[in-house]
Amino acid sequence: MKVITAAKIRDTVSELCIKANLVLRKDVLSALNSAYLKETNKRAKEILGAIVKNAFIAKKEKLAICQDTGLPVVFVEIGQNVRIVGDLKAAILKGVELGYKRGNLRSSIIKNPLLRGKPTDNLAIIHLNFVKGNKLKLMVLPKGFGCENKTQLHMFKPTAKIDEIKEFIISVVKSAGPDACPPFVVGVGIGGTADYACFLAKKALLNKLNAKRYTLNASLESDLLKQINKLNIGPMGLGGKTTALAVDIETYPTHIAGLPVAVNISCHALRSASREI
């Protein structure tokens, strides 16, 4: 049995909040560089170049990649042979608070969605998953709301065809347009219940971009990416063939009477950081 203290979790979450907001993921940066080399639209190419330059400046100067430092979503994988000493939830929330203060990251979270009020920095969305082993993995995804606001869920009939599902996903990207700061990473969740499909769509954003995953979804992801990049939305909505960097699909078994499909879009600043303890 491996023992992990709440203090260790707190400090790790704090560091991950800072890293995620200041250092763009290598796979995202690689995808942006690749898109820059392939883009033929002059204005789109200039915008992609500016996005890449911004990422380098953020890392060098220890500044946030984007002024919207997001709502921290923390995914926790807890090994069955791990014992946590202390309050896990309190440790995560304190880690978020410390990370946002130490990293000089904007406070964006309000405690009451109806009354609004002054933003705070000690709140997060926490997802727990129990796995085999004696490791604890923490993944922090700061989700900006320019793109989060474009999330959509559709409860298809179980008789729905693949083309109908593709049409829905593409329509979500179209409606997001320039507001969600393309080029996008498109996360798709299919199956489960309504809430679980939305969870899967967000979790898909943690996947390494354009990795060769030999799954049944691979051809669908590839086809969707090609169709999305024909929309001519382009970087920041000003045209070009780089509307999305990747499409990632996560699936889960569902009820015979339903077919939930959710789409969660990330802007070009797809930020996340993870660590095993």
Model-predicted segments: where are they?
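Non-transmembrane, aqueous-exposed alpha-helical and coiled segments at domain scale
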Residues: 1-188, 193-277
